[in-house]
Amino acid sequence: MVKVPVVRVNEKAILPHYATFQAAGMDLAACLDEPVTLAPFSTALIPTGLAIELPPGYEAQLRPRSGLALKHMISLPNAPATIDADYRGEVMVILVNYGKTPFIVCHGDRIAQMVVARYEHVRLEEVKALSETDRGDGGFGHTGV
């Protein structure tokens, strides 16, 4: 298991945890001094009170929580958001309210999931043409909706 150092940049921060044994993502909690109200169709930057040190070759992906999306239309507009291995600042979550009613975020609310994943850098090689496939350039629903 990969170890990821974490620092509470706010003493009230809640450490992320996996809700179940095989969960892919850890729940991230809001670290707030006072509640934040998300008006319909508005965004807010929500602090977690945590900073992490990912090893080289890893990223943290921030993703919406399905229950918040289903029940309240709360999501992350840039999902999945990426935390790079060389970032050392506080992990912040951009929330958006796609719903019709205000949504209140309180300290300790689980607001997102964090999935730590490996990645590889690639070297792009410019060529004159790409190899042909049966699919070709078909995309955006070309196989049906």
Curated annotation (Swiss-Prot):
Protein origin, superkingdom: Bacteria
InterPro entries cross-referenced by the UniProt entry: dUTPase, dUTPase-like, dUTPase-like_sf, dUTPase_trimeric
Signal peptide (residue range): none
Reaction(s) catalysed by this chain's protein: dUTP + H2O = dUMP + diphosphate + H(+)
SUPFAM superfamilies in the cross-refs: dUTPase-like
Chain positions recorded as substrate binding sites: R65, S66, G67, N78, T82, I83, D84, M92
Cofactor: Mg(2+)
Sections of the chain in a coiled coil: none
Pathway: Pyrimidine metabolism; dUMP biosynthesis; dUMP from dCTP (dUTP route): step 2/2
Pfam family, one: dUTPase
UniProtKB keywords: Hydrolase, Magnesium, Metal-binding, Nucleotide metabolism
EC number(s) per entry: 3.6.1.23
Enzyme class: hydrolase
One MF term in the entry's GO annotations: magnesium ion binding
GO BP annotations, alphabetical order: dUMP biosynthetic process; dUTP catabolic process
Family recorded in the similarity comment: Belongs to the dUTPase family.
Functional note: This enzyme is involved in nucleotide metabolism: it produces dUMP, the immediate precursor of thymidine nucleotides and it decreases the intracellular concentration of dUTP so that uracil cannot be incorporated into DNA.
Record-linked PANTHER family: DEOXYURIDINE 5'-TRIPHOSPHATE NUCLEOTIDOHYDROLASE (PTHR11241:SF0)
Name of the featured protein: Deoxyuridine 5'-triphosphate nucleotidohydrolase
Gene that specifies this protein: dut
